[in-house]
Curated annotation (Swiss-Prot):
Molecular function as annotated in GO: rRNA binding; structural constituent of ribosome; tRNA binding
Gene this protein is translated from: rplA
Single GO cellular component term: cytosolic large ribosomal subunit
Organism: Burkholderia vietnamiensis (strain G4 / LMG 22486)
Keyword NAD: no
Assembly notes: Part of the 50S ribosomal subunit.
An example Gene Ontology biological process: regulation of translation
Name assigned to this protein: Large ribosomal subunit protein uL1
Length: 232
């Protein structure tokens, strides 16, 4: 068994795994535990009351976090003509068509997100085996296949995050950095929860948001009392 570091032991001692913490206390604990030598991510795990094995209960979407993610994002866009110019004006680092596809096939993928105009999917569709496993394949469900490429680029730059439920029925997302003020993290968490509520499958029965836990990159999970999320 791997030896538990003193730092980890200190975190474990501070957090009661069975307790539901008010959002203010949960954020304070998570930020306190984020004492690594780098600006740790603040992550959230949301257990949903769905059956992830059923295709009609797959929860997927995107949301622009009001306080951003604290990360700079490089955007590649498949577009031509006027839409290509609009994408560049919006801040896209890479814009192209067949030339961009060839770069990707050659392993040149210096970007974090791919956006595509619908008329380019004949090209993008050939890249599924490359982009898909990396989570980069454009999809209309998360707003990355759209005729309004300029807005999609701006959203990506502004702090848009994509979410998709895993096989265990859990959504994992980053809502900021340890350097963020607690109010900013709370605002981002509220935006994500609202987006998840809107994405609730019609066939989902019972309690939808079952558990919410926050953690930093090197910290431990802190469960959140959902009743305190509604209080401003």
């Amino acid at each position: 068994m791997a030896k538990i570091s003193k730092r980890r032991q200190a975190f474990e001692a501070k957090v009661d795994r069975q307790k539901l913490y008010a959002i203010e206390d949960a954020l304070a604990l998570v930020k306190e535990c984020a004492s690594a030598k780098f600006n740790e991510s603040i992550d959230v795990a949301v257990q949903l009351g769905i059956d992830a094995k059923k295709s009609d209960q797959v929860v997927r979407g995107s949301v622009v976090l009001p306080a951003g993610t604290g990360k700079s994002v490089r955007v590649a866009v498949f577009a031509q003509g006027e839409k290509a110019e609009q994408a560049r004006a919006a801040g896209a680092e890479i814009v192209g068509m067949e030339d961009l596809a060839e770069q990707i096939k050659a392993g040149q993928m210096d970007f974090d997100i791919v956006i595509a105009s619908p008329d380019t999917m004949r090209i993008v569709g050939t890249l599924g085996q490359i982009l898909g496993p990396r989570g980069l394949m454009p999809n209309p469900k998360v707003g990355t296949v759209t005729p309004d490429v300029a807005t999609a680029v701006k959203n990506a730059k502004a702090g848009q995050v994509q979410f998709r439920v895993d096989k265990a029925g859990i959504i994992h997302a980053t809502i900021g950095r340890a350097s963020f003020e607690a109010t900013a993290l709370r605002s981002n968490l509220s935006a994500l929860i609202e987006a998840l509520q809107k994405a609730k499958p019609a066939t989902s029965k019972g309690v939808y948001l079952r558990k919410i836990a926050l953690s930093s990159t090197m910290g431990v999970g802190v469960r959140v009392d959902q009743a305190t999320l509604a209080a401003q």
